[in-house]
Structure formats: structure tokens, C-alpha cells
Amino acid sequence: MRRSDYLLVFLGALLLALSRLPLNLGWLVFIGWIPFLMVFERCNCRPRQLLWVAAIKAVVYILVVMYWIGAVTPPGLIGIVLVYTGFYFIAFYAIYRIYALLPKLRYMGFVAVLISFEYVQNFGETRFPWFNQAYSLADYTILIQLADLGGVVLLSLLCLLFNVLIYRLLAHKRRLQPLVIIILLLGLWLGYGHYCLRYKPLEKHEAQIHVMQPSIEQDLKWDEEQYYRSMALFQELTLKAVEDSARLVIWPEGAVTRYLRHDLQAQLDLKAILDTVKVDIFTGFPHFEPAPPGHRNQELYYNAATLVRPGPVFGELYFKNILVPMGERTLWLDTFPFLWVLNFQQANWEFGTKLEYFQSGNLEFSPSICYELAFPEIHHRMAIPWDGLQHRYRKCDYLVNITNDAWFGTSYGPWLHAMMAKFRAVENRIQIYRSANTGISLVVDPKGRILAQTRLFEVTNITAPLYTSPEITLQRRIHRWPMLVLAFALLITLLSCVKTMPRRS
């Protein structure tokens, strides 16, 4: 590899990173991989050089898009750079071998390997699907309508396909085939988006659901004296929502900082608020239960949430199913119990094991907590669960996401996290109400349009009419289709591995 190749890699990584930020540069995702295609086309990389390519991609992308991790845990930022350098090296090495040994499949292999790289990040305790290219399209609501057919994986696949087509057009200027395909694909893509936005029917309901954003600073949130100030603020904001005819008020993740189901004073404090406001409240709080015999700890701790009605009447508890790797739980504790001795100031919550569905008024919703918003599959099961008794899908009226993004500070993190709600809404054609402690709180309709949104650290409530759609999306029915892409990527990678690499001249 020449020095210019490393510069191309740096340029491509920078373009892809900038496409993710709220700078109206999402279109860069359609050309950001072209420098990488130019490098792979030369097919003269050694493994050590590919490791440098992977390191440049990981360092540039993570420092531009995810620099805010370093403000919370500098070792965590270093760790994620090292881990994804390894992941990118595996992906790039597979692509390199496909280019060198299966050249007729090189473009298909390029797309399939990178799609597989994104898709596998949805599984296992290390799951961290923040590298999905589809999220670069967050500003283009018309383009994300296609997510109801194939999810974010289909959107990412199209982004990569456009990179390949534009590269071929630039490399072979006299060939019109890539240009024709680009025009045809873009026309179909925009046409479907226009049809969905204009013609897909929605039913409007005056549900009077309000989302609270109290904006309590992370450094103060868990202070004992702050607890009383927080509860007073919650009552004040909830009363304002009631004055606006609220029937349900959604508080953020961990709003009640005490163990609500075990703390009598916290229950009395919440009862006093409920007696005053006389509306349903959905809130997050920490929770613990006795550990089973033989467990290392005496209690199991959960990141929990529930619906509370005047009385108070507590609903079933929802326990967060997907935890932030290392932030909320050390990896592989069940497999390697000796890891319990490690202390990185993480919480070590337990995994929730089931979803919950709540009824407020005559409307049904299912909740997710914080990081879970990044995962399409769990939201498919929340929004459109399978009814095993009647052997058919049924659909909730809306979804709720609560989060505490205070630790993001004023970085791009809250925006990146919040925009995922647009994709989850379109994938399932369902409205999402999102309460974030310090922002960004929002209401997104089933077409991915933001109906209401807060500013960072704004103290306020927001609301919007509820729009529902009876549609059971194709994506819900076939959401495992990326497994086919993964299988194809594995197959051609294995084929390239059994062939002998040609000698270098």
C-alpha cells in the first residue's frame, strides 16, 4: 500500500463519520465508501497493512461520532477503539480475500460482508449497533420509509450499493449502466417514500399523552437531597400536564431514584403526587429482588419501569432486557463468574427476560428503556407481538421509550440516540413517545415524522395527538432476512479462504 492509500482510508472514514452527525451531511453516506473501494481494487494489501486500515477507520469514526464516551469513561473509549479495530480488520481481511480470489463476486462480497458486520452487532452481550449506516439518513424522512419493508439493514444495503454504483460510474465513465441503475433505484426509493408519506392512512386519537423532561443534571440526580427537589419538580410538571388535559404522563428512566417497591417513603411521596394530579404515571426506577440460592449476591438489581395509577395501583414491572456493555453490566458474568471481582464502577444490573404491555385508558403500549431503542428486533416484538393462542400478530397502539441521557452532556450523543426512534417507528408503523431526562425527548408518528421535540436541558412537557396504523409491516414478518446476507458473506469468505493467494510480483 502507498501513503496515498492510507489518506484515502482516512478520507473515507471522515466522510462516513460526518454523515452521522446533525450537520445535514447525511448524503455523504452514499460516497463515503468509495475511497475504500479504490484501495481494495488494487488488491495489494498485506494483513499488517489491513490492520492499519482498520485502525484508521475505527479511530476516525469513533473519535468523531462517539467521542462523548471518553467524557464518561476514557478507558471505555480506548476499549471500543481496540475492539472495533479488530472487528474492522476481520471484515476488511474478508473483503480483501474476496477481491483477490473471487473478483467476479467482489462487489457483492463487499456489500455482504459490511452488512453482516452491522447485523451481528445486534447479538450477544457486546452488542452495540451504533455503526449502522442507515442512521445517516435520519434527516431524510422520505428515504427511511423503506424501513417498513426491510428495516435499517435494507437502508444500509442501499447506501452501500450506491457507493458501488457511483464508484463504477466514476471508474468507467463511458459505461452508462451504473447511471441508469442509480436513476432507477433512486426513483423507486423516492417514489415509495412519497407514497408512504402521502397516502398511507393513519387514524388520529386525542389520547392526551404527555412526555416529561425534567433535566436533572447527572452529578445531582442520585444525591439524597436532590430526591426531594426532583419529586417536587415532577409534581409541578405533572400538574402543568394535567392543566393541559393529560391522562398519562411519562417520566424518564430512573426518575424515582429510590427502590420504589421497597421504600415506603418513596411510595408515600408518589401517592401524594398521584392524589393531587389524578392521572396515570409511567416512570422508571431501580429495583431489586432476592437472589436465588447459590448466587454471588444476596439481591438481583434491575433497571425497572412501571405504570402507576392513582391509589396507587402498580402495574407489572418491566425490567430492561438489553444492557449497555460494561456501562450497566460487566460482560459474560454468567459464563465467567470470576469477573464479578472486576470493578469499573459499572452497575451490574440483571437482564430482564420478558416484555410487558400496559393499558392506560383504552390504549395499550409497551415500553423500552434507554439503549434498547437501538435494537429493531425487540421493538418488533413490543409493537407487534405474536398471539400464540390466535396464531396471528396483534398490534399495540403506541410505544414508550424512557431514558437518562444526561451523561451525554451537550455532545451529539443525545441527538444520535433520539433519531433512532424515527427508524423504530417506521419499521413497525407505530407512534413512539420518548421521555429523556435532559433531552432529547420527542414524539414520532408512524411515518417517522417528529410531531414534538424538546431542546437539550429544557425543563418542559411535550405532547402530540396519537396516530395509529393497523398495518402489520413486511419487516415484522421477515425481520430475520439479513441472515441470508450473513450466510452468503460467510460462504464466499470461506471459499476465498480455501483458495491459494497468488504470489506477489
Task: Pin down the residues of each PLM region.
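Soluble catalytic domains of enzymes that build or remodel membrane lipids, polysaccharides, and related
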Residues: 197-481
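Membrane-embedded alpha-helical bundles of multi-pass enzymes
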Residues: 1-197, 402, 409-411, 451, ...
